[in-house]
Structures are given as structure tokens and as C-alpha cells.
Design a protein with these regions (language model features):
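Substrate-recognition element of Asp-dependent hydrolases with the DxDx(T/V) motif
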Residues: 12, 24, 92-118, 127
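Conserved Lys-Pro-Asp/Glu-containing loop-to-beta segment of HAD-superfamily phosphomonoesterases
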Residues: 142-171
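Acidic, Mg2+-coordinating phosphoryl-transfer loop and its flanking beta/alpha structural elements
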Residues: 163-203
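Metal-dependent phosphoesterase signature
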Residues: 54-91, 99
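A short, structured active-site edge motif that brings together acidic residues
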Residues: 124-139
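Helix-loop "lid/cap" segments that line or gate small-molecule binding pockets
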Residues: 27-28, 48-61, 117-120, 149-152
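Surface-exposed amphipathic alpha-helices with a cationic face
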Residues: 90-97, 150, 171-175
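Active-site neighborhood of HAD-like aspartate-dependent phosphohydrolases
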Residues: 1-43, 57
Length: 216
């Protein structure tokens, strides 16, 4: 049914909360803002980082760029490794690859960072292509990321594709492009968020995700 499966990265393949939140706190400290608690800052996980600083703190463009620079200063060297792969993801990817599925990554994270994470957890070999943002922030919206992944792999039959993610941006991006989606509840988005965004399927954990994907 679905021969091409697109995975979000943060909150779907790996739990990157610690590294992202600590790096956001580092950036906010530099700007002179006392960061909120971890639950507040978890909203930074998933959306493009520039968009988050602007939306949550109403920074002007110059301050956004300073915040992004400081975020990356810490995240590139330390934060990217403050990360854990969700239990069972590697087994799932192996089974899907064994069934001949084409696996793609569609993330708002810059491609070099995404590749670092995938290589760190030794799951990079399962993916045919990694689509993500450019370092300057271009192509960071999830719709653009998904479109780019499909274009670069010459995928025309949208009915053969499904997107998996934990936030509304993943689901909305999939709908905008015209493909089905699965929302996962083990990441950073809740049932209401994923349901209201229009997820075609919602699963609680990696086991449920595996059962669903292997049933297609």
C-alpha cells in the first residue's frame, strides 16, 4: 500500500529534548532572557528554530539571528549528542527495509545535523535520502521539506507515500503535499494536536507504529 515512508527526526526517530532545550536556554541566557521551564521550551522541538524564537519571544530579525547563532554554538558541539533513539526504531527500520520500502527522512533540522544524528545512532544506512533545512534557514517549513524529498527521489505517485511525525507541522505538511500521515504520541505532540491537524492514523508507541506500518 505504501512503498515510500517519510520519517520526521526529532520526536519520531530520536528523543532530542535534552540537547535542544539546553541549547535554547544557552541562547536565551546570551540574549538576557530567563528561560521558562522545560515544558515551555519543549515547544521548540519540531518547528524551525528561527520560527520558534520569533513566535515564542517576539524577537526582531537581528535578535533571531543572534539567538540561532548561540543555539547552534552549543547544539553543534554538545547538544546534538544529548539524544536517545527510541527503543525499537532500529528494528522497525530494518524490517521495513527488508520488505523493500523506500525510507526517507523529512526534518526541519539542517541536513548536516540530521546526518550527524543518523550516523551517531547507526541508522543512516536505512535511509535513501535525507531532506531538511539549509543552514541559512531556507527550506525549513515541513511542506517544503516533504516536497523536496519527493522531488529529489522522482516520486510521482503520492498515494504510495506516508509521513510519520509527532507534531502538527508534520501532519499539516503531509496534507498540504497530498500524502497520508501517521501521528505518534511518544514524541512531543499530544492526541488533540495531531487529531486536529488531520492525522490519518495516530499511534501510542513504537510497537503500535510497527504493527501499523507492517500491516500495509
Amino acid at each position: 500500500m505504501f512503498s515510500t515512508i517519510l520519517f520526521d527526526l526529532d520526536g519520531t526517530l530520536t528523543d532530542s529534548k535534552t540537547g535542544i532545550i539546553k541549547s535554547v536556554q544557552y541562547a536565551l541566557d546570551y540574549i538576557g532572557i530567563k528561560a521558562g521551564n522545560n515544558n515551555d521550551l519543549s515547544n521548540f522541538i519540531g518547528p524551525p528554530i528561527r520560527q520558534s524564537f520569533k513566535e515564542f519571544y517576539d524577537f526582531d530579525d537581528n535578535t533571531v539571528e543572534k539567538a540561532v547563532e548561540k543555539f547552534r554554538e552549543r547544539y553543534f558541539s554538545v547538544g546534538v549528542y544529548e539524544n536517545e533513539m527510541y527503543k525499537g526504531i532500529d528494528v522497525l527500520l530494518s524490517m521495513l527495509k527488508g520488505k523493500g520500502k523506500t525510507l526517507l527522512v523529512a526534518t526541519s533540522k539542517p541536513v548536516p545535523l540530521a546526518n550527524t544524528v543518523l550516523s551517531h545512532f547507526r541508522i543512516d544506512n536505512y535511509f535513501t535520502f535525507v531532506s531538511g533545512a539549509e543552514m541559512n534557514g531556507n527550506r525549513s517549513e515541513k511542506t517544503e521539506v516533504i516536497e523536496y524529498a519527493l522531488e529529489q527521489n522522482n516520486i510521482i505517485d503520492l498515494s504510495s507515500c506516508i509521513m510519520i511525525g509527532d507534531r502538527k507541522h508534520d501532519i499539516i505538511g503531509a496534507k498540504s503535499v497530498g500524502i497520508k500521515s501517521i501521528g505518534v504520541l511518544y514524541g512531543y505532540g499530544g492526541f488533540e494536536e495531531l487529531s486536529e491537524a488531520g492525522a490519518d492514523y495516530i499511534v501510542k508507541n513504537v510497537n503500535e507504529l510497527s504493527e501499523l506500518l507492517l500491516s500495509f
